[in-house]
Amino acid sequence: MQRAKAVEGSVGTSTVANMMNRDHMRAFFRRTAALVAFVALLWAVHLLNWIIGYGLNPAFGLIPRHVSGLDGVIAMPLLHGSFAHLMANTLPLLVMGGLLVATTTRALLPVNAVMIGLGGGLVWRFGSSAIHIGASGLVFGWFGFLVARGLVDRSPITLGAALVVGVLYGSLLWGVFPGQPGVSWEAHLFRALAGAAAAFLVRTHVHVPRLGGVDLD
């Protein structure tokens, strides 16, 4: 009788674990779909922007210390100056965004809110008097978050993600220094700092789905 109850309890626990794992997988695919949809939105907005002669950039770009430029805090990542500009940001967005959605199952919205709000606010307050556009600030923000989170959490997963972005995109750090014509180094710097701050301010839950019944933690 006791053995039967033990087996029954084990089966019940296994069933619950499998259900939780399926929930995590579904959430992962939803987040991945959202990431792909976001990148597709960037291309759709840019196509429209190109058709109208890039009129969206002065209308919705971030203009430091101008009230009319405050909407750029949110709209800035959606706007680009050319197809080459957007193409240069697309792959890093997919790679770092993929690492983000694969290793962070909670607090994604707060993390991005801190990064976009704080980083964009600092650009608006301290940035140069120009129209700041582009998703590269978002790339730097995710870079800062992934690296800082690895140092904060020190789990194998977060350290692995930090190592991957460090190896693949460590050269990005040159982008936080001034002196590059036409480059919003302020957006790079402040978004990266905001992403790092998000790693300290927002606790995230790390989970890797089980494959074939084996944990990949």
Feature names for model-found ranges:
Residues 2-217:
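A detector for small-residue-rich transmembrane helices and their helix-helix packing motifs
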